[in-house]
Amino acid sequence: MLDQAIQESLDSKRYFSDPYPLFAQLRSTAPVLRSEVIGGWILTRYADVESVLKDSETFSSKGRVTHLLNQLGDEVQPRLQLLHFHFARGLAHSDAPEHRRLRGILAHAFTPRMIEGLRERIKEVAEETVSKLEERSDLIAELLTPLPAQIVGELLGSSREDIPHLIRWAHAINGLYEKGGRISEEKALFAEAMLGQMREFVGKLVAARKELQKRGLLTGEEDVISALVAQGDEGLTEDELLSTAVTLFVAGHETTTHLLGNGWFALLQRPEIIDQARHRPELIANLVEEMARFDGSVPRSWRIAKRDTEISGAQIKAGEIGRAHV
């Protein structure tokens, strides 16, 4: 039995700030660990993680959040209908072939022209935001949070004035989880309310694009929602469109903030790399990619076993949750 202190450290501040020493320890002592802290299995060895993430026949991306919501009891479930609906479908909560279909539709919306325009817009917003920084500034609060939020917001067709509302809604939905990945009733009800407000807001954006389409004024290149609406019957359903737009903002802006924050923290500990990038800007593209690999914003992925199976000698039962650390 693994030492209780190690079990508890899976939920500590130290784990969330720097999990890699613990991962190394687990890889050598318990690479497939049953943890009561998270109510499931923790995988830390590369070969095991790779096999789980590639085996969609045995492990599913669907149902993890709804499984946790159901643990809150029957009485509260009628008040969590939007959360159940949102987390039961969509790009982040589907398996092949449904995941492949949704991904293909979304990829079609990101045309080369849109991506190139987005590249220029990111540069403009970044320069504008940096120009407002004082000599000593909070990079997370003043740059790394507002920058991706504004870009993703504009990508969806929202105005700058809407960004604070989008951030508030996204924080509530992303903040659904307690320590260990569990969900409390209080946070679930708050997230339900915020998700309702966000879906209503996105619904108005979709309705406005559809009105332009009826009048023959929609090109499909105005923003991502316009591109998705323009695909018509070959694209997403109304519910899929709402869920996709919500997911793009909720997942898109915070993961970028965390990636940039982790990257800057790593660079500040290695000033020689900053100096290299300053004198050799051609290295920056590879540097950004390496930042995502070195200390990514989401170092884990959840799966649910579809059937009884075995991972490196550990017996995993159907319906059990696994947390694969990447």
Regions found by a protein language model. Name each.
Residues 1-325:
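Cytochrome P450
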